[in-house]
A protein has these predicted regions:
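Core segments of cupin and vicinal oxygen chelate
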Residues: 42-93, 133, 140, 159-162
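Short, small/polar residue-rich loop motifs at catalytic or cofactor-binding pockets
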Residues: 154-156
């Protein structure tokens, strides 16, 4: 039986165990994931996006131009030229790569402001200490609630908001 074929019904001799707490990175045989490194978001104003996510509490790890054959080959856009800003969550694993495309310019989806059930990247959620304070700090940077701040049982206050370039973010405040 090849590695890709299914075992006969009842034959468990070739089945591999699911990852366990003692081996969390093992997935599908020898293929592994070490970690989720970052989420990439295309923006139309890199400075505004950096200011927004800095106000949210992220730290700017660095900014750099991205261009050349290697970059175009990776993303499938020959002759591309962009600038990226890598933002990180302090003292936690989690980074956002904000990218401003100069060549070719970014494509605006139609409709420009898509609803929450649009296929593709849905949203990025951040746990915050105080949801109302966070919203108050983000509003001057263009943040707008999508719905309303809502209590989920006795566990969380939750909301969706739009940030720079129409990015949907979710905020979650854990209730004690």
């Amino acid at each position: 039986m090849s590695r890709c074929s299914r075992p006969a019904p009842g034959d468990s001799s070739r089945l591999r165990a699911l990852p366990t707490a003692s081996d969390p990175a093992r997935i599908l045989g020898d293929m592994t994931i070490q970690r989720m490194d970052n989420v990439g978001i295309v923006v139309d104003d890199l400075d505004a996006a950096v200011a927004f996510f800095t106000e949210l509490g992220m730290e700017l790890e660095g900014r750099m131009p991205t261009e050349g054959a290697w970059a175009g080959n990776v993303v499938g856009l020959r002759g591309m030229r962009s600038e990226i800003a890598m933002m990180r969550v302090p003292d936690a694993p989690g980074r956002l790569e904000l990218a401003k495309y100069h060549t070719p310019t970014a494509i605006t989806p139609k409709p420009e402001i898509t609803p929450a059930n649009t296929l593709g990247l849905h949203r990025v959620m951040f746990a915050v200490d105080d949801i109302e304070d966070t919203l108050a700090r983000l509003r001057p940077h263009g943040a707008e609630l999508v719905g309303e701040v809502t209590r989920y049982e006795d566990s969380y206050l939750l909301c969706y908001l739009r940030g720079p370039s129409g990015i949907i973010l979710a905020l979650a405040e854990q209730l004690s």
